[in-house]
Amino acid sequence: MEPRVGNKFRLGRKIGSGSFGEIYLGTDVQTNEEVAIKLESVKTAHPQLSYESRIYRVLQGGTGIPNMKWYGVEGDYNVLVMDLLGPSLEDLFSYCKRQFSLKTVLMLADQMINRLEFIHSKSYLHRDIKPDNFLMGLGRRANQVYIIDYGLAKKYRDSSTHRHIPYRENKSLIGTPRYASLNTHLGIEQSRRDDIESLGYILMYFLKGSLPWQGLKAGNKKQKYDKISEKKVSTSIETLCRGHPTEFASYFHYCRSLRFDDKPDYAYLKRLFRNLFIREGFQFDFVFDWTVYKYQQSQSGNPQPRPHDGGVGTSSGLNPAVGNSEKRPDVPNQRTNPDFTLKQKDKNGNDSAIAKDKLLPGSLNLGRSEGSSSRRVVDTSSREPFSGGSDNANYETALKGIDGLRINNNAGDETAATPQSNGDDVEPQSKAL
């Protein structure tokens, strides 16, 4: 008899694992829809799936928040059934030779800021902002960024009164050291400003290919964390952002100007990057670097190793990155966005245009389902520049992630630090994914 959970979901092959347990591909036996099933032993020392499921319930309905389909106990396991998602940004970064173009970084940044704004609006901090925890969707949501893994999330204010948690020091480092804010390294209680600063480090990681504090050698984890902290403190914002648009330095200066209980001006941060996007003459066409790279590989007839199958998100290694400073050649736009008034120019200065069947040959499995709506990129509201709807005739072929992508990542040089038992953190003491 085939294994089932919740009397509704058929358990399939394993697609990932983490400190919490394992992730399996599953199928809804009623709809035949594929899902991701997270299993955690009920005997684990620090169970976290129950805690995470409660946070998912709070966040349900938000754009870029995976849908939780079922949570319960089956035999010896706590079980969480969720949407099946595509590759993580870490996997896609590796697929693209460990560097993203400015255009891709800006398209991602807009959505990632929106994700943090939504989580914060629900009175929670994420506290483990890293590329592994941002995944692309599948099907008509393939251009949508999702944020996962709430095992280290913490409520920072009362939902009714909005009273903020108190400022405290001498806190243990919680999160992934590579992307932790300066204040987190200094032992200061985390707040909204720290999630935002961590996102800034991700953006620079994508642009530069690596961060200055990667690959440091140390005898143990504490020494490693101390060295990362020292290097991060000694690296000025200008040094970190050298060679890249000044908007990135402005982003960090703003983050570090925030007081502990300040609400970040998310609209200002999005406006910084949207104005840069416009000034560069980019088009919000959702042609990310991985789309370009797969297209080039299909044309060269020499496909490269590919990222993992889509899942709810398996943690990939965070090895020291090697930057690739070469710009990728232009590729024709997948579509034309009628709402966007700027055009991209080809090498001769002309507006580029190409038939869709030229960009998407039959051998290139980039799209399967239909639909995605779009918004003008200069709109500074909190809505997405696109909603992933199914009624946009101008975008008939939505990216479906990258089918069958696989990446083999080795163990990273940094892992997420977990809360220590200090009597004041009520969240789980273990880290998933």
Swiss-Prot record:
Residues 362-375 have a biased composition (Low complexity). Residues 297-433 are annotated as: Disordered. Pfam families: Pkinase (PF00069). Keywords: ATP-binding, Cytoplasm, Kinase, Nucleotide-binding, Phosphoprotein, Serine/threonine-protein kinase, Transferase. GO terms for molecular function: ATP binding; protein serine kinase activity; protein serine/threonine kinase activity. Residues 407-423 have a biased composition (Polar residues). The modification Phosphoserine is found at residue 390. GO terms for cellular component: cytoplasm. Its main location: cytoplasm. InterPro entries: CK1_Ser-Thr_kinase (IPR050235), Kinase-like_dom_sf (IPR011009), Prot_kinase_dom (IPR000719), Protein_kinase_ATP_BS (IPR017441), Ser/Thr_kinase_AS (IPR008271). Residues 342-359 have a biased composition (Basic and acidic residues). SUPFAM superfamilies: Protein kinase-like (PK-like). Autophosphorylated. It catalyses: L-seryl-[protein] + ATP = O-phospho-L-seryl-[protein] + ADP + H(+); L-threonyl-[protein] + ATP = O-phospho-L-threonyl-[protein] + ADP + H(+). The keyword Plastid does not apply. SMART domains: S_TKc (SM00220). Its EC number is 2.7.11.1. It is an enzyme of class 2 (transferase). Belongs to the protein kinase superfamily. CK1 Ser/Thr protein kinase family. Casein kinase I subfamily. Casein kinases are operationally defined by their preferential utilization of acidic proteins such as caseins as substrates. It can phosphorylate a large number of proteins. This is Casein kinase 1-like protein 5. It comes from Arabidopsis thaliana.
